[in-house]
From Swiss-Prot:
The keyword Membrane applies. It comes from Danio rerio. It is a multi-pass membrane protein. Residues 191-212 are annotated as: Disordered. This is Claudin-7-A.
Length: 212
């Protein structure tokens, strides 16, 4: 059977990873204004996220505006949104399934093999959710890099990575690690001897008992 310590570690890493995914999805700092070129204006820092854009003044004032219409957003941002939401939902579902199959829980404790397989299934679901988040973060980062090095992009509209995308990346990788630990909870099949006990051995044992 699987080691309960490994299962607990995988569960903890997955839980922290899911929290990181949620926090990273909510925060607006997915990309921030890049200070490049000769004329650099540092009075205002612009942040853009999946749900809103913010402007941070040098005076310490922060103004945020939620995106009004989904249809006005580009397809890349909508795809990133969808993948992050799917990744979070699938990861939470996988964590719930894995918690049922962990050795430290009492649910279904009568069947040890089925319980371990349940934990393994939860780990696989977690890996699927983490993969969605990794693809979303990587695709968003690819678009930021492509726009940054595009010579036709105005200097004042160039962006670089913000803190939120790194939080989401870290959460997804923790989710992958935790899901892999839970998915490794594969039950070992019991080894059955291929050769039954011979009749001669049984008769010899019986004759020995008679002489005792």
């Amino acid at each position: 059977m699987a080691n309960s310590g490994v299962q607990l570690l995988g569960f903890g890493l997955s839980l922290i990873g899911i929290i990181g995914l949620i926090v990273g999805t909510i925060l607006p700092q997915w990309k921030m204004s890049a200070y490049v070129g000769d004329s650099i204006i540092t009075a205002v820092a612009t942040y853009q996220g999946l749900w809103m854009s913010c402007a941070f003044q040098s005076t310490g004032q922060l103004q945020c505006k939620i995106y009004d219409s989904i249809l006005q957003l580009d397809s890349d941002l909508q795809a990133t949104r969808a993948l992050m939401i799917v990744g979070i939902i699938v990861s939470i579902a996988g964590l719930g399934v894995a918690s049922i199959g962990m050795k430290c829980t009492t649910c279904g404790a009568d069947d040890k093999v089925r319980k371990t397989r349940t934990a393994m299934t939860g780990g696989i679901i977690l890996l699927v959710g983490a993969l969605c988040a990794v693809v979303a973060c990587s695709w968003f980062a690819h678009n930021v890099i492509r726009a940054f090095y595009n010579p036709f992009t105005p200097v004042n509209t160039k962006f670089e990575f913000g803190a939120a995308i790194f939080i989401a990346w870290g959460g997804s990788f923790l989710d992958v690690l935790g899901g892999a630990m839970l998915a490794a909870s594969c039950p070992r099949s019991k080894q059955v001897s291929k050769y039954p006990k011979s009749n001669s051995t049984r008769s010899a044992n019986g004759s020995n008992k008679e002489y005792v």
